[in-house]
């Protein structure tokens, strides 16, 4: 089994080091990750400036770009082979609910999925890397289980996994979940630069809004490892009928080519 590993915290982050060390015992692994922290970069690609790939002393390759850049470059020429699995993380903090829209960790895994490769995004629920070895061990266990069920290397799928910061033996079983929801982000933070200019920092993520049973928020709060299958299609299928009727009322029959 060949695995490509990336992340959004940067190639030196404890999460990706722990994940690499855990997975190298069961597979051929290669790391291609951002040079610096690229959190909240989602699926962004760098199109208007050159990207450079360098190799660290431990063999990790790092790119002056986004998480999606790293996976894209790896899969379109850098590796020279097609991996069986793309794994992203382990992220320093949760990627639950609305976080998945912004997450560079999820973005890296989604890039693998877009190239037709099964992909998993791993995150720890709390920041600070507490119990990171436990999280890496759980990630390895999940990958092994997927491989044993012949799911690795087959039709593409995308999973978002959040692991509580707990000792391995204290973690409760995997729980299949839907995404919860957060409240809107906190108010922007205003500061004054040394030159007297007003500058802004994006506020923190909002608290959980929908943390009902069945959500990733609920599962991890009760010690479970949450697993959520994701998809790329953003179509609002429930709203298609409503909007078809609404748009039909907005567009004159002649413009739509219909005969009155």
Swiss-Prot record:
What molecular function does GO assign, one term?
exopolyphosphatase activity
Instruction: Summarize the protein's role.
Output: Nucleotidase that shows phosphatase activity on nucleoside 5'-monophosphates.
Question: Which residues, if any, are the signal sequence?
Answer: none
Provide GO CC annotations from the record.
cytoplasm
Q: Which organism is it from?
A: Acidovorax ebreus (strain TPSY) (Diaphorobacter sp. (strain TPSY))
Q: State the top-level EC class.
A: hydrolase
EC number(s) from the headed UniProt entry: 3.1.3.5
Q: Matching Pfam families, A to Z?
A: SurE
PANTHER family referenced in this protein's UniProt entry, alphabetically: 5'-NUCLEOTIDASE SURE (PTHR30457), 5'_3'-NUCLEOTIDASE SURE (PTHR30457:SF12)
Q: What reaction gets catalysed by this protein?
A: a ribonucleoside 5'-phosphate + H2O = a ribonucleoside + phosphate
Report the sequence similarity comment from the record: Belongs to the SurE nucleotidase family.
What protein name applies here?
5'-nucleotidase SurE
